[in-house]
Amino acid sequence: MSETKKQPGRLKNRSEFLAVQAGEKRRGSTFLVEVLDRRAPETEPRVGFTVTKRQGNAVERNRMRRRLKEAVRLSAGVAMKPGHDYVIVARRDVLDTAFPKLQSLLIERIEGTAKPKRSQETRSRKE
């Protein structure tokens, strides 16, 4: 079993995580994906994971992180573009989401194929 695409590298220090915060944000109910184009297409993609203390105790936070890491390893890693950095910020719903659904949501966010937004005419319901 040889994979055609190599697994993404890791973001390891605070300055790398902070640099990605300046990039694009792709929001969702289960997690947020922050993406930064490093403008170096020949380099491998890199990924980092963040789970804040507000999301639960250490056991729950580690479980969220492990689920996201495994989803990236199994399927979402191949969707990552070379020369890009990704930070995945977990929300509590990561624990309750079925794993296949989590994988598909992660691929969707990484590829940037989110649901289309409402048009300006239908946006306000109060008028």
UniProtKB/Swiss-Prot annotation:
One Gene Ontology cellular component annotation held by this UniProt entry: ribonuclease P complex
EC number: 3.1.26.5
UniProt cross-references to InterPro entries, sorted A to Z: Ribosomal_Su5_D2-typ_SF, Ribsml_uS5_D2-typ_fold_subgr, RNase_P
Keyword Calcium listed: no
One BP term from GO: tRNA 5'-leader removal
Known catalytic reactions: Endonucleolytic cleavage of RNA, removing 5'-extranucleotides from tRNA precursor
Keywords per UniProt: Endonuclease, Hydrolase, Nuclease, RNA-binding, tRNA processing
Enzyme class: hydrolase
Family matches, as Pfam families: Ribonuclease_P
GO MF terms held by the record: 3'-tRNA processing endoribonuclease activity; ribonuclease P activity; tRNA binding
Signal sequence residues: none
Assembly notes: Consists of a catalytic RNA component (M1 or rnpB) and a protein subunit.
Function of the protein: RNaseP catalyzes the removal of the 5'-leader sequence from pre-tRNA to produce the mature 5'-terminus. It can also cleave other RNA substrates such as 4.5S RNA. The protein component plays an auxiliary but essential role in vivo by binding to the 5'-leader sequence and broadening the substrate specificity of the ribozyme.
UniProt xrefs under HAMAP family: RNase_P (MF_00227)
Family indicated by similarity: Belongs to the RnpA family.
Protein's name in the database: Ribonuclease P protein component
Species the sequence originates in: Agrobacterium fabrum (strain C58 / ATCC 33970) (Agrobacterium tumefaciens (strain C58))
Gene (name only): rnpA
